[in-house]
Amino acid sequence: MRVNADFSQRIVVRPRPEDWVASPQPGVTRLMLDRVGAEVARATSLVRYAPRSTFPAHTHGGGEEILVLDGTFSDEFGDHPPGTYFRNPPGTSHAPRTEEGCLLFVKLWQFAPGDTAAVRIETRGGAWLPGRTHGLEVMPLHEHQGVSTALVRWAPGTQFPAHTHPGGEEILVLEGTLEDEEGAYPAGTWLRNPRFSRHAPFSREGALIYVKVGHLGAPALGDAITA
């Protein structure tokens, strides 16, 4: 299966109700943002668990990255409330469940070779650092060999200078509206800007975004998955 699998293309996804599809596990649906592979896949998805859903214990051969967007996601290691960011490195396993239901942003098989760090951050209590331009605050989440992941908070009226992303950029708009010369991206929008793309983003109303840079074209454990 291939969904938005040409990583040289700019992709903008504004999720619609009809975009959600059932997974093999009852009570779990997903919206595929990009995907290469069948059930073992290099994948970026939104995943929704219905209340009282469970998922069988499984191992992540290529690692798993999760941001909890809504509800409480649980496994044998604890309860993970909204805003929790974690990385389960290659070879780790767990048995997910949820009592109230939850919505997750999930990336699979995208760990770099040699990246073995386990990460868990409750971002709603995390520290914010000054950004590179007035009106921006940044909460770093992870960095490995030039691939960086962070939350970025935009105050209303913030303008970022035009810049180029040699290693590409991926954004999930969590709150507010982000804009650039190509359009406006309200909360829930997912964007993938290819390598060497250029833009001048801004936010008139303010925004909170998840952003990953430097990963397109960088080595990942899922590179060997082709279909």
Predicted features and spans:
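A short, N-terminal "cap"/entry segment at the start of jelly-roll beta-barrel domains
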Residues: 1-39, 101, 105-146, 226-227
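Ligand-binding loop in jelly-roll beta-barrel domains
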Residues: 28, 38, 79, 90-114, ...
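Catalytic core of non-heme Fe(II) oxygenases with the double-stranded beta-helix
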Residues: 28, 53, 57, 132-149, ...
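Short histidine-centered beta-strand/loop micro-motifs
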Residues: 45-46, 56-60, 77-78, 96-97, ...
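Fold-core signature of tandem repeat domains
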Residues: 47-49, 55, 67, 86, ...
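Glycine- and acidic-residue-biased ligand/ion/polar-headgroup-sensing regions
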Residues: 50-51, 60-75, 165-181, 187
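Short acidic-glycine-tyrosine-enriched beta hairpin
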Residues: 74-93, 179-199
